[in-house]
UniProtKB/Swiss-Prot annotation:
GO terms for molecular function: 3-isopropylmalate dehydratase activity. Pathway: Amino-acid biosynthesis; L-leucine biosynthesis; L-leucine from 3-methyl-2-oxobutanoate: step 2/4. GO terms for biological process: L-leucine biosynthetic process. It comes from the Bacteria. The gene is leuD. It comes from Endomicrobium trichonymphae. This is 3-isopropylmalate dehydratase small subunit.
Amino acid sequence: MSDIILKGKVHKYGSNVNTDEIIPARYLNTTDPTILSKYCMEDIDKNFVKNVKAGDIIVAENNFGCGSSREHAPIAIKASGISAVIANSFARIFFRNSINIGLPILESQKAVKAIENGDAVEINLTKGIIKNITKNESYQSQPFPEFMQKVIKSGGLLGYIKS
């Protein structure tokens, strides 16, 4: 399998970004990714949707995706154009939901500490290498097992099952 490479600008957040901040409950009357993406992160970053470009990357501190167990949160993030999320740690249900919908998430304390908002970052998902292009630094994260890489490359669990 060829390496999966992602590249984008960083949008950085702190600790305990919860699912209600990622996609507020008032928008949970739909599962349409396009609609959800319009409101992604609006309660903590009013300009998120306006500033995100396809391929961009979220970097956050601890316990990203905590709170309610809603699949809407990773769907909104992915549909907004974000290609991956890097954090010190993730809420476990958010971690599982992200993989299930094909949103790559990586844990790397060194990367989170060094990467700043607006930095250009390249991720080699296959090898678990996070490269800060802006600072010319690299950080190692745990690469996904081959099976999970196939799930992500297929766009999520449903895409993997269909392929």
